[in-house]
Amino acid sequence: MKKISVVTATRAEYGILKPLIRRLLACEQWETQVIVTGTHLEAAFGNTVQEIEGDDVPIYRRIPILNTENDASGVDDAYAVTLTMAAALRGFGAYFREEQPDLLIILGDRTEMLAIAAAAMNAQIPIAHLHGGELTQGAVDDCVRHALTKMSYLHFASAEVYRERIVQMGEDPSRVYNVGALGVENIMNEKLMTPQELAASADFPADQPYAVVTFHPVTLEQGTCPQQEAAVRQMHELLDAMRARPDLFFLITKANSDAGGRQINELLEGETADEPNMKLVASLGMKRYLSAVKHAQFVLGNSSSGIIEAPALGVPTVNIGDRQQGRIMAKSVIGCEPERSAMIAAMDQALRLSERIRVDRQLRERLRVENPYGDGHTSEKIMAVLEQYMKLDRIDLKKKFYDLPDLQHQ
């Protein structure tokens, strides 16, 4: 029987992949191997492997890769990220050598995925990549994402403009599909919690006005060296802006493991402990997170969930800085600089928009319809393509560069 491997390394990634993983596991045409790695296996990031176990997803293998070596420059500087990539190359190289899956499914733009894809490429294992063609000009993710595109054989884009961009990079249009975003599918199909259920589960006052906050380090912030200093400085600005709104409660999820992430989390642990209107959690899990966003006044930070999931729920987003610059953004996304006064003004604007959405049903529905990331049937569309390709005796990995028609004779 043929084998498909699907890799998840972070809480956000697993939440997005969940509907696809369910369909993969239910398919009897092949064996699905779920490989868990990265921050899932680390206590500092909430041991989010427990969420996967709680969903009764069979974990085929756990491959620890995250560097926890503490040195004078911090545990998550650029060198530590490099060490994590090296561990991923070694660990997944051994896995691919042993198992030889017929297809590897990866999502997004994280550096560990670059190493995992390189190991698969060396083992001549075809790669199916989700969320290629996107832009996040404030992060190193752009370079990683585009490299993953060139290493992959099948491409599942979340919007038409991203599908076109993948083709623009020389990928054969017959292997590039606009399927929408799995995050939108989660919203449409997951039974989310009521405010009362959420308050009991997450232990915060969900019945009063609140915002959901996630702020990750910006890995390509110009003129910032080291990156940790920029991350901490911007987080201080955000904390000061939140303190200016004592009438709001702030539910804060920890930053990711990018360079500067641990410094942000350490700052949050120290600064929020005595704040009556702030609660810090390592991870909410997909269902609680989406439930929290659904009932929030707005989403605050620089996470892609504010660009994809929040608009699909009809919730405004205050998008801080340029980490998500280049993505398609709904009209409910309000951009601002990572400075206290700009953040306060953007929060005020988001609150006004939130009130308009609350009382104007037509506006609420219009904002949801204008969400550019698909119709909620993404996993079904991906499965249809996979079933077609998995019937082939073999996949020819030799790829011809596709020149755009209007450039071929210039």
Q: What do these predicted ranges mean?
A:
Residues 1-410:
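Nucleotide-activated sugar donor-binding and catalytic core shared by glycosyltransferases
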